[in-house]
């Protein structure tokens, strides 16, 4: 549950109420005079507002008042008080059902009601002296189910014109640029369809934004990514798919990893046209194997679960293979095994250092024993590469790396590097528990646990990985090409 603290100053005293809001919310109903002690605000019948601790007073045309107990009904959960850089105050209100968004700089009525509510609520929970000024009134919020146009417009307007005079904090006390999304938008992140929305402000009565069928997931999903751990939003091109809020490492596509590791303009892919032909005619009632491959190809733009090729890493020529978990769970079939085998053979002939980035659920069951053969085939050519030619192979394990990949080339590197918090195992937790009838200790299959047991050489964050690889290559006498 998130909380909000509004920097609104109030004082204590006595308050007379001569009316309250009716349940209909669109009209006022008379009520008996109610006196609340310990509040220093008074309204008289002429609608003049006085502060007992102040010398000045002013009048404002106001209808009947509301009692403190009704303030939560009067001020909607969708109303926010903000202050701009010139210390001017505004109220911001939006109505989901009516598709209405309003910014008003004349909200003295609401401000009075809100002050009164804060004061009376605070008095019920405080025993401090009458002369104290109190800040940061605590208000419990509710879940906000916002449509996308409100989400986008509030964010753009706030960042352009208004400095929010409040702090939006999660339970972990992390504050970041996505606080607007986290506080206003629902945690589920579900997007509702919208038709035609107009947003206006009472300051200039002009339309700020008028859009049709605005959907952030359709127009901006190539720019933003959502953390699957804390649901925070971040700009994926800059942050390397590492959540700013919780530090969670999100999965990366193979193309993103290539872009992260290889110098621009130096990538030369290999065997791009190699595709699986369903060698054992695998039968499935749910979805034929051929259809699953076609679907994965359309989703990822890849022909299979690995990309191989050559390029330069800080000027050092390297052979690189990157597995893609989004293609059928990164499973290793005959095509994956053949492409990696050919890459290793090419690196052997050209005497290139080798990097294999692993992200796989293991052998592909739709290809039966042919997928298991790839483990031996890749291990065989790696033996020639490492033992006979004395070349340098670095294995990078990302989350998840399991099954046949872990049991073969994943753990055969001269240097084995893992990403932070990576899930690395041969058999998954569920399989072990069902087989042995014992619980698997929490974190026992995480990279940090494997490092302590000596199964890994290092855990390297993504932002440091390219530099670490460059230093390791130079340590093993692989240097950048001379630039003439």
Curated annotation (Swiss-Prot):
Disulfide bonds: none annotated. PROSITE patterns: COA_CT_NTER. The keyword ATP-binding applies. Component of the acetyl coenzyme A carboxylase (ACC) complex. Biotin carboxylase (BC) catalyzes the carboxylation of biotin on its carrier protein (BCCP) and then the CO(2) group is transferred by the transcarboxylase to acetyl-CoA to form malonyl-CoA. HAMAP family: AcetylCoA_CT_beta. Its EC number is 2.1.3.15. The keyword DNA damage does not apply. It catalyses: N(6)-carboxybiotinyl-L-lysyl-[protein] + acetyl-CoA = N(6)-biotinyl-L-lysyl-[protein] + malonyl-CoA. The lineage of its organism: Eukaryota, Viridiplantae, Streptophyta, Embryophyta, Tracheophyta. This is Acetyl-coenzyme A carboxylase carboxyl transferase subunit beta, chloroplastic. A zinc finger (C4-type) spans 227-246.
């Amino acid at each position: 549950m998130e909380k909000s603290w509004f920097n609104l100053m109030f004082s204590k005293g006595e308050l007379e109420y001569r009316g309250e809001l009716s349940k209909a919310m669109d009209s006022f109903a008379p009520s008996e005079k109610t006196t609340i002690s310990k509040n220093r605000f008074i309204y008289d019948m002429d609608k003049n507002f006085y502060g007992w601790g102040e010398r000045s007073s002013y009048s404002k045309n106001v209808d009947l008042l509301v009692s403190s107990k009704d303030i939560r009904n009067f001020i909607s959960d969708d109303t926010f008080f903000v202050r701009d850089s010139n210390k001017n105050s505004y109220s911001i209100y939006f109505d989901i059902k009516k598709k209405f968004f309003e910014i008003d700089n004349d909200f003295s009525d609401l401000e009075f009601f809100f002050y009164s509510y804060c004061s009376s609520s605070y008095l019920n929970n405080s025993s401090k002296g009458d002369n104290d000024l109190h800040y940061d009134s605590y208000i419990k919020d509710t879940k906000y189910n916002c449509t996308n146009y409100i989400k986008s417009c509030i964010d753009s307007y706030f960042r352009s014109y208004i400095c929010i005079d409040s702090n939006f904090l999660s339970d972990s006390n992390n504050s970041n640029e996505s606080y607007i999304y986290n506080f206003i938008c629902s945690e589920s992140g579900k997007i509702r369809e919208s038709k035609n929305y107009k947003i206006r402000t009472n300051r200039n009565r002009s339309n700020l934004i008028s859009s049709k069928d605005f959907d952030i997931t359709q127009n901006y999903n190539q720019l933003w990514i959502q953390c699957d751990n804390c649901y925070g939003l971040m700009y994926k091109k800059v942050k390397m798919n590492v959540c700013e809020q919780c530090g969670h490492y999100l999965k990366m596509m193979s193309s993103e990893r290539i872009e992260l590791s290889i110098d621009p303009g130096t990538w030369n892919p290999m065997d791009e046209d190699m595709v699986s032909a369903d060698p054992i005619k695998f039968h499935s009632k749910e979805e034929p194997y051929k259809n699953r491959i076609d679907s994965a190809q359309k989703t990822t733009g890849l022909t299979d679960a690995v990309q191989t090729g050559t390029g330069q890493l800080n000027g050092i020529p390297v052979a690189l293979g990157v597995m893609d978990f989004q293609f059928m769970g990164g499973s290793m079939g005959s095509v994956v095994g053949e492409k990696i085998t050919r890459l290793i053979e090419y690196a052997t002939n050209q005497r290139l250092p080798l990097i294999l980035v692993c992200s796989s659920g293991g052998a592909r069951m739709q290809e039966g024993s042919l997928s298991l053969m790839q483990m031996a085939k890749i291990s065989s050519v790696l033996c020639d590469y490492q033992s006979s030619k004395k070349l340098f192979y670095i294995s990078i394990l990302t989350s998840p790396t399991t099954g046949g990949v872990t049991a073969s080339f994943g753990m055969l590197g001269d240097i084995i590097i893992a990403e932070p918090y990576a899930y690395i195992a041969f058999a998954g937790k569920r399989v072990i528990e069902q087989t042995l009838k014992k619980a698997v200790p929490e974190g026992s299959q995480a990279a940090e646990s494997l490092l302590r047991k000596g199964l890994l050489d290092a855990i390297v964050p993504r932002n440091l990985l390219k530099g670490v690889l460059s230093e390791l290559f130079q340590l093993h006498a692989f240097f950048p090409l001379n630039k003439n």
